[in-house]
Every structure is written in C-alpha cells, then in structure tokens.
Amino acid sequence: MSLLATLGLELDRALLPASGLGWLVDYGKLPLAPAPLGPYEVLGGALEGGLPGGGEPLAGDGFSDWMTERVDFTALLPLEAPLPPGTLPPPSPAPPDLEAMASLLKKELEQMEDFFLDAPLLPPPSPPPPPPPAAAPSLPLPLPLPTFDLPQPPTLDTLDLLAVYCRSEAGPGDSGLSTLPVPQQPPPLAPLPSPARPAPYPSPASTRGDRKQKKRDQNKSAALRYRQRKRAEGEALEGECQGLEARNRELRERAESVEREIQYVKDLLIEVYKARSQRTRST
C-alpha cells in the first residue's frame, strides 16, 4: 500500500466509532491489488525477498514501523479553542439610541423647511425663443422675354365689307360720289433681325490664331528685354573702358615725366664725373 492509502485508513479508524471497526478489520484481511509503482517507490516484499503485492510484512522491517505509527493531527485543528458548554456567547453591541436619532432627524427636517421658506420665490425661467427658420435658398427666376405688339395690316375681307357699307350708305341715286378706291395692301414688314447668339465654344481656327499671336507677342517682348539688357551691359562696359583709358593716359604721362627726370639726373652725373676727372688731370 502507498503512503496516502495508509494515511487514509488511519484517518478512517480515528474518525469512525468503535462499533463500526468490525467491517474495517475484515476489509484489511482481503488481498489488495498491487498499486502502481512510482519512479521512486518499491514494494516492501520485493526488498525483503517476498513477492510483490502478497504476504504480510516481516516484523521489524522498514515499512512496519512507520505504517503502524500513530500520527497526532491536533496541529491541524483551528487555533481558537471551542467554548465550553456552560459559557454564554459574548454580548452583542448595544443598538443605537432611537430617540436620539429621531431628534436629530427632526432637527434636520426643520432646518431644511426654514431654508425653503426663507428662499425668495423666483419666477421660472422663460424658455429661449425658437430660432428663426432658415431661409430657403432662392433661385433666380428667368426674366420674361419682351413681347413686341406689331400693328397687323387690315385684311382684304375687312376692306371689301367697308366698301359695300359705304356704297349702301350713299344710296343708288347719288351718282356724284365716286367709289372709294381700294386701299393698297402695305408691303409686309421685314422680320426683325434676331440677336446673334454667341458661339458656345471658340472655333479651333480662331484659337490657333490667338495662340500664334500670343506666342508672337511673347517673343517680341523677350527680344525687347534681351536688347535692352545687352544695351545696358554695353553702356556699362563702354563707361568702364573709358575710365580705364583715362587712367592709362595719366599713368603714361607720369611715367614719361619720371623717365625725363631720370635722364636729367644721369646727364648731371656724367657732367660731374667729367668735371672731376678734368680737375684731377690738371692737378
């Protein structure tokens, strides 16, 4: 048997009454099935040369001592000692004073009532006016086209009826009156020229011509700017050249004057040398 099975058997014996240990003794005499061996567990019979799972352990072997040893499990019981049967449980805390609580509640209610009575009665705030309805976007209505009422010429039927009425009014005996001449129908009026409707898009020819003209104008303006820039550069170079020429003339004149002075000094030195040599010869 394993250690857990042995401990379980000892606990059952300690907890069960003495009257119920008879069947447990009989149960202990039954042969037990061999328990599965763990990696560090061997049977006592195998150690002593007996068969595993059968036979009684030998007296004085290593298993019989600790298997029959009594274990004290009182250390696992709760630390608090149970109350003896004659003692009473500790008294519960006294309930709060109901009269004191009622008086405090009454005072609070009186203070709240005084506060509400002293507060001025303010009229309820009026609700904010509703926002004005958003104006619907008005679409521009098309303007009515002007109508031209042209005087219509009288028709031939109206003229004929008018002539018959005039004859009947003149009478048959009135021969002095001549018949009214039939008025000539006025020439029909020429239709009014309709306003020229602009083309929905420019023609390709005009667009191409506009592009060429625009390109030509751009080239002209670019050439004009180039000529102006070159003219300004030429004028600046010409002014600088004139300044350098004036400086060159001034330096040339100064160099010529210095050269004349040097030649004059040379001539003086030659004359002095000649005069000194003549003086030495004469002496």
Curated annotation (Swiss-Prot):
It is found in: Cytoplasm; Nucleus; Cytoplasm, Cytoskeleton, Microtubule organizing center, Centrosome. Residues 209-272 form the bZIP domain. Keywords: Acetylation, Activator, Cytoplasm, Cytoskeleton, DNA-binding, Nucleus, Phosphoprotein, Transcription, Transcription regulation, Ubl conjugation. Highly expressed in liver and at lower levels in heart, brain, lung, kidney, adipose tissue, and skeletal muscle. Expressed in some immature and in all mature olfactory sensory neurons (at protein level). Residues 121-145, 183-203 have a biased composition (Pro residues). Residues 1-21 are annotated as: Required for protein stabilization induced by IL1B. The modification N6-acetyllysine is found at residue 29. Acetylated at Lys-29 by EP300, the acetylation enhances the interaction with CEBPB, DNA-binding and transactivation activity. Residues 211-231 are annotated as: Basic motif. The modification Phosphoserine is found at residue 257. PROSITE patterns: BZIP (PS50217). Residues 237-251 are annotated as: Leucine-zipper. GO terms for molecular function: chromatin binding; DNA-binding transcription activator activity, RNA polymerase II-specific; DNA-binding transcription factor activity; kinase binding; RNA polymerase II transcription regulatory region sequence-specific DNA binding; sequence-specific DNA binding; transcription cis-regulatory region binding; tubulin binding. Its main location: cytoplasm. One of its GO terms (cellular component) is nucleoplasm. Transcription factor that either stimulates or represses gene transcription through binding of different DNA regulatory elements such as cAMP response element (CRE) (consensus: 5'-GTGACGT[AC][AG]-3'), ATF5-specific response element (ARE) (consensus: 5'-C[CT]TCT[CT]CCTT[AT]-3') but also the amino acid response element (AARE), present in many viral and cellular promoters. Critically involved, often in a cell type-dependent manner, in cell survival, proliferation, and differentiation. Its transcriptional activity is enhanced by CCND3 and slightly inhibited by CDK4. Binds DNA as a dimer. Interacts with PTP4A1/PRL-1. Interacts with CCND3, but not with CCND1 or CCND2. Interacts with HSPA1A or HSPA1B; the interaction protects ATF5 from degradation via proteasome-dependent and caspase-dependent processes. Interacts (via C-terminal region) with NPM1 (via C-terminal region); the interaction leads to loss of association between HSPA1A or HSPA1B and ATF5 and promotes ATF5 degradation via proteasome-dependent and caspase-dependent processes. Interacts with NLK; the interaction stabilizes ATF5 at the protein level in a kinase-independent manner. Belongs to the bZIP family. This is Cyclic AMP-dependent transcription factor ATF-5. It comes from Mus musculus (Mouse).
